[in-house]
């Protein structure tokens, strides 16, 4: 048995802590009888003490200490020529062995006490601490040691048994050995009584091949305060291999064994010499990645001259590896020296690769950490130097100077109360610690206050001709909006200054409401800012949050001023008819102050809490309908209605704007591709009938994408395309079947059917009123309505029925049809909700047509509200209804007299080909619709 000075010192310190006097004496004795490793050998391996720092600081703890017995049991085989092999590997290195501490032990021991090892097997020549928790086993080991026969058999448990035994594993008390990553194992033998022969042999849970080991020392540990369990730590020294033959005793377990010897080998064999040299070289590489393995190498060099023993070298190499238990057990079971060297070499190669990878990872981490630390220290030094030289001030001083520098040029235009607030906040910021939460709140507040454009107005162009040119180049039509903007510019020219206005554009989707807002800003030369309030339900989006809240911010209007940098931008508030309302407040009510010209000069944001002048801002709002806008808010707006486009207007828009953009998006700028006028008309009439042009834009892009696909395929096939023309017959191939059929259900309307006109979000459409009898001659005279009619339209039906019965008596005194017959009035397209009073004269005409069995005048459509006395009242949507009439092929239309002015304002393109009649009483309607033959 041998021990080095290093491990002896560690054991001595541990023994002193455990107050084990006999252990301390034994360790001191071992220490006195040890010596250092041969210098020449260590220098050859690069493991001399002077090279301790040559491999970096990234290390791993070694697992064991290598020792040797002096019994000379012949396990090394033939070693006659090993010196030459070693010399070739390491050169002519002189070695002087240390003073050997011998422990006499029998060369043959047929029965041994079995010590199961839950994890690592014990290699011959290896020292391993083992924790024992079985009191009977501890007592037996102490008794054997007192008799001088402390020899045991150490067997690795099989996997299932090892996992079970390790559950009670305690802490390793040998700090020195634990620091070198030696395995501490736990053994818990239940000390069960002898059982029948048929019972399973507990020794079967251990591998058959183990290690004959000497118990060098036993140290009692303090009793576990939790379980009351007593335990001790053994120090086992492996000597040679043995095979378990059977169980002799079970309490504690004694097994019959056979001591094994290595197979004979020729040390001069070239393969063994080469493998030995490679093992030594690999150990040398391993020392470079893990310098702490040098201690293990020193122990080996003390006891074996110049690595002349290949079997021991193989065991040493295996003990230095962190392989799993099965691989190490395989090395232990190999009796062939050549096979053992090969297996050890494979494990060492893997260990070297793991060490290199670990070293690389460690190096990268250390470089990053050291680089960050170096950069941090340099930055701190730089700050200190600049501060001493007066080149840099602290963050708080720099912030105050920044805010002051930003605010002073605006002080003259900032209101006095606001300037006072800013000065107070600057003074407050100077007295706050940068680490306090109030410091950040004050800093953010000053950031907003000093960033606003107090009194800073952007340049604007009050040039009517320039504005007209810009508006016409961006949009076709929309004359009402353009005229209103030109009026705004004209007033500004005459007054020399402009005031803020609130203009609301109402119209169906896709007519250009949003885009015209940007064109207005371009025409005026002002900054543009847009935000949508559709679905907004939090009033803080308009008025801002209180500064007491975490993450508080001003509202959208204050953000707009900071973003644009001027106090007179054009602000587009999109989808104002879709404002929400929730528990956070009512944004529509918050807009009352914002959109009131009398109040927005002192708009108060919750975050800023100082008045802000918004009177120079031009607000442009957009909406699809006015019904959902609250009355007080609508009262503050100047409404401009945008109607849908007729077919001719859509053609012009498509040719002038949309088609060119679609070609460029599809990459067809240099390709000869076009759509014929007939195809364009059909595309608009049968595919894109909505009031706007957004759907038309999508269809044009789809057509040109199909053309782009054809061009790309032709280029791939090296085919030449002269030109591509899309005609009417090609539309199905490009955009599919038309979704809209003709509006006309009847070519010739029968009695009881009349064509009406309706306004929809799509612009306008024709609406058929159908009436038929369900019962006759029973005197009921009831009326039933269907077609998903709203309450107002149902009331119009009732009024029409009542009025028609009296009117029929005047025109046809003997006709009792309406009095005796139950009627059913239906409005087709039953899935579409319908409401409004404008179908009054249409329903009345339908009832009279059925009662008198007379069809209405061909190609006639009408709209108007009817009273009980027969008066016809004005309705809305004249332009949309007129467009719908033209699209359906109507030639004659009837409007209320009150809508004559609206009709006269329509362009000639819309009125062309229509014969309009304006009526004030139903009698005039009757003459045009049912008595037209007599009047003509």
From Swiss-Prot:
Organism: Ostreococcus lucimarinus (strain CCE9901)
Entries under SUPFAM superfamilies matching the protein: P-loop containing nucleoside triphosphate hydrolases, PUA domain-like, Ribosomal protein S5 domain 2-like
PANTHER family listed in its UniProt record: LON PROTEASE (PTHR43718), LON PROTEASE HOMOLOG, MITOCHONDRIAL (PTHR43718:SF2)
One record GO biological process: mitochondrion organization
Predominant place of localization: mitochondrion
Gene Ontology terms, MF aspect: ATP binding; ATP hydrolysis activity; ATP-dependent peptidase activity; sequence-specific DNA binding; serine-type endopeptidase activity; single-stranded DNA binding
NCBIfam families per record: lon (TIGR00763)
Subunit structure and binding partners: Homohexamer or homoheptamer. Organized in a ring with a central cavity.
Location of the protein in the cell: Mitochondrion matrix
Residue numbers annotated as active site: 838, 881
SMART domains attached to this UniProt entry: AAA, LON
Keyword Transmembrane helix: no
Boundaries of every Lon proteolytic domain copy: 748-932
Protein's name in the database: Lon protease homolog, mitochondrial
Reaction catalysed by this enzyme: Hydrolysis of proteins in presence of ATP
Chain spans, region Disordered: 65-95
